[in-house]
């Protein structure tokens, strides 16, 4: 009833337990018609290097100080050292001057003052100090001149005219004083020793000048008026003080 073919299936040729050859895709489809079999082609040659690259990426970097092994960079190695800002940026090419405490000048000035304190020359400051004395003297003379000018300018015009009048009167009073002295000499007749003295020896009411023929023209009452009047005496004393100040 059944026809036995001369060809035996390949699965029967292999002994029991031996792996048989893999069936072809057509056989697998015919044997399992109700199942969907994925017939994607696998590439073992390409999968192998991909797995190797994944293993290389997954393997951690060896740590150690041995030669030839690259060391991992630390985060501290990437930090750049920062410098503290001590001054404001300026356009001066010389840079910032060092900060100095309060009440302290430039180092060169400090050195100059120390040298001056030790007895050395302090620079042009000493010459300036020496030159101040004549200037002060000239200023004092100028002040005195200006003060005298101011006092003369402060005197009003009327007062200046009065001064001139007083000077004229004082000169007249001085002449009057000399006249009074002559009259006094004539009244006493103490200075009538020469021949020309007969003019001064002719006083009224005196008999000593009998040899003199000239009449007595002088009034002896002038002397009495000058001596009796306190005002005239005071004026004469003032005139004497002005004329004979020495």
From Swiss-Prot:
- An example Gene Ontology biological process: embryonic skeletal system morphogenesis
- Subcellular localization, as worded in the UniProt entry: Nucleus; Cytoplasm
Segments crossing the lipid bilayer: none
Q: Where is the composition biased (Low complexity)?
A: 14-26
What Pfam families does the record point to?
A: MDFI (PF15316)
- Keywords on this record? Cytoplasm, Developmental protein, Differentiation, Nucleus
Q: Which residues form the MDFI domain?
A: 99-246
* Residue numbers spanned by region Disordered: 1-76, 91-151
Q: List the record's Gene Ontology CC terms alphabetically.
A: cytoplasm; nucleus
Superkingdom classification of source: Eukaryota
The UniProt GO MF terms for this protein read: identical protein binding; protein sequestering activity; transcription regulator inhibitor activity
Signal peptide feature range: none
Q: Does the keyword Cytoplasm apply?
A: yes
Tell me the function of this protein.
Inhibits the transactivation activity of the Myod family of myogenic factors and represses myogenesis. Acts by associating with Myod family members and retaining them in the cytoplasm by masking their nuclear localization signals. Can also interfere with the DNA-binding activity of Myod family members. Plays an important role in trophoblast and chondrogenic differentiation. Regulates the transcriptional activity of TCF7L1/TCF3 by interacting directly with TCF7L1/TCF3 and preventing it from binding DNA. Binds to the axin complex, resulting in an increase in the level of free beta-catenin.
Subunit structure, interactors included = Interacts (via C-terminus) with AXIN1 and LEF1. Interacts with CCNT2. Interacts (via C-terminus) with Piezo channel composed of PIEZO1 or PIEZO2; the interaction prolongs Piezo channel inactivation.
| Stated family | Belongs to the MDFI family.
Name listed for the protein in its UniProt record? MyoD family inhibitor
In the record, what lineage is assigned to the organism producing the protein?
A: Eukaryota, Metazoa, Chordata, Craniata, Vertebrata
